[in-house]
Amino acid sequence: MRKKIACVTAAILSISLGVSGCGLIPFEQDIPFLSSRAENAETEKKTEQQTIDEQDADTEKSTEDTQQDDGLNEGEQTDNEDTEEADEKQENPMEQAALMAVQYDYDGAIELLKSQPDYESNTDMQSAVLDYENTKATCTEYPLEQITHVFFHTLIKDTARAFDGDSDSNGYNQYMTTIDEFNKIIQSMYDKGYVMVSPHDMAVINEDGTMSRGSIMLPPGKIPFVLSQDDVSYYHYMDGDGFASKLVVDSNGEVKNEYIEDDGSVSTGDYDMVPLIDTFVKEHPDFSYHGRKGILAMTGYDGVLGYRTDIAYKTGKKLQDDQKKFLEDHPDFNYKQEVKNAKKVAKAMKAEGWEFASHTWGHKDVAATSLDDLKRDDKKWKKYVAPILGETDMIIFAFGADIGSWEGYSTDNEKYEFYKSQGYRYFCNVDSSQYFVQITDDYFRQGRRNLDGYRMYYNPEMLSDLFDVSEVWDSSRPTPVPGM
């Protein structure tokens, strides 16, 4: 935490502390070329029921016997946790308060300084509190129904490898965004006043289980938005196609990506959304509301965050060809260590403001999949993904699908009632409207806008509130972008 505050202090000094809904468009689909891969994760459709039952039978008993041994249920404490806690106790309260205030947590900053033993005699603290109170007075409550939600898939680092003409190139062109495009999009949104918030800021769950509207207070000119990214598992099919291979915690305790170069060497850096946003927020801390970052929508069939943590890699049963090849290429694969490493990354991410959502274990189309299959799928997510990433009350539906119409969920909706019974209260689909938000006593629902090659090429006018497509478009992207 001390490193974080030290990194942003200079940026804070340069930032001033002063400062009806669209019609719904039919839900769009999210990465169709993942459909066959997700189905293959459980075998062909005609034998899916039998295969799932067999795999559950194979692993149910062994899971209870081995989960402690494989690390899924072990604690997440890291070797340097005590050191981090000691550092936090020694942080400069003025710097802490400055970071809180620049990220719009004026109450937190004021409370922190007023709680210091020497506050009554410290004129610097008193002056800072006065500044924070004055800035807070300029804030207004932002209309929750006018908060947009944008999302990306894994970012392309090397366009030559991604757009090399193979069977996946068209899909990458449609549904992915390059790092160069992403950086320009984020800069444009920052320049326009956008600030990252969370669905948990927009709606809160009360002690009695009901849901209430949240309140987001921002200075004039600031615009809240939600950011998410789908499928941050670095699937096997993406190997060698110009994408990062995993997320890691580097020697400085920061989350970065590993990238395998053409010659097989491994580079570490900002090669996907998580480290890129982390770096951007260090330089522009006012891009984050109360320290919020984005949400990662996670499947589990190929593991998480680039780590092969699904139980199939441990049992060796029901493996797909690319999973078999991975194990053959890595004869020293250690499942327990893989789980431990993934937990370390997830913990570091959450400490920096990132959140996780279910994307279903098998990248399921929730509209087309039976309730029984969804129950089995969610059981796998909770058994093999949640122990690594943590429990979540958010589900971001794959393929842009949904479990109900635009009118809302009702108590006679069996899929909704099931997901609610499993603790999910925040639901997101894909919708190209500028904003689509529903907040009821029972659930929060929000549509997401895809910022990818297809949307930028065919509907640039729909993104003009965020950025000018002509200014962010990567010239190395092949045109025309394939249609749907």
Name each region found by the language model:
Residues A101, D107-P199, G214-P219, I223-L227, ...:
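C-terminal active-site subregion of NodB/CE4 polysaccharide deacetylases
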Residues P26-T138:
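N-terminal, intrinsically disordered, polar/charged segments of Gram-positive cell-envelope systems
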Residues R2-I31:
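Sec-dependent N-terminal signal peptides of Gram-positive bacterial secreted proteins and lipoproteins
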Residues P93, F182, N341-A342, D412:
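Amphipathic coiled-coil/heptad-repeat helices and related helical stalk/stem segments
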Residues E145-G165, G209-M211, L218-F225, S233-I403:
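Metal-dependent polysaccharide deacetylase catalytic core of the NodB/CE4 family, i.e.
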